[in-house]
């Protein structure tokens, strides 16, 4: 019975670790995506100030 109990505990620890890791990874991906969008907007804002860059990338620059 001791080996069965140890094996069961091992499986519970592995399962718990996997579930916690999966959920925390999802949260960090969401934060990374949000930060990435902010960086992208900042880069396009700089590009939109430059007339030549604005003309080449009109789809990213709002109409004035």
UniProtKB/Swiss-Prot annotation:
Disulfide bridges in this chain: 47-53, 48-61
Propeptide: 22-41
Alphabetized InterPro entries for the sequence: Conotoxin_a-typ (IPR009958)
First-listed, main subcellular location of the protein, grouped into a coarse class: secreted
UniProt keyword list: Acetylcholine receptor inhibiting toxin, Disulfide bond, Ion channel impairing toxin, Neurotoxin, Postsynaptic neurotoxin, Secreted, Signal, Toxin
Stretch list, region Lacks the Ser-Xaa-Pro motif that is crucial for potent interaction with nAChR: 49-51
Compartment(s) where it occurs, according to its Swiss-Prot or TrEMBL record: Secreted
Cellular compartments per GO CC: extracellular region; host cell postsynaptic membrane
Entry comment describing in which tissues the protein is expressed: Expressed by the venom duct.
GO MF annotation terms: acetylcholine receptor inhibitor activity; ion channel regulator activity; toxin activity
Top-level division of the source organism's lineage: Eukaryota
Signal peptide: 1-21
Function: Alpha-conotoxins act on postsynaptic membranes, they bind to the nicotinic acetylcholine receptors (nAChR) and thus inhibit them. Has possibly a distinct nAChR binding mode from other alpha-conotoxins, due to a different three residue motif (Lys-Xaa-Pro instead of the conserved Ser-Xaa-Pro motif).
Free-text comment about domains: The cysteine framework is I (CC-C-C). Alpha4/7 pattern.
Family: Belongs to the conotoxin A superfamily.
Name assigned to this protein: Alpha-conotoxin-like Lp1.8
């Amino acid at each position: 019975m001791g080996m069965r109990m140890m094996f069961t505990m091992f499986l519970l620890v592995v399962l718990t670790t996997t579930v916690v890791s999966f959920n925390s990874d999802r949260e960090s991906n969401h934060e990374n995506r949000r930060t990435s969008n902010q960086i992208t907007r900042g880069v396009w804002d700089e590009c939109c100030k430059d007339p030549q860059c604005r003309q080449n990338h009109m789809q990213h620059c709002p109409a004035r």
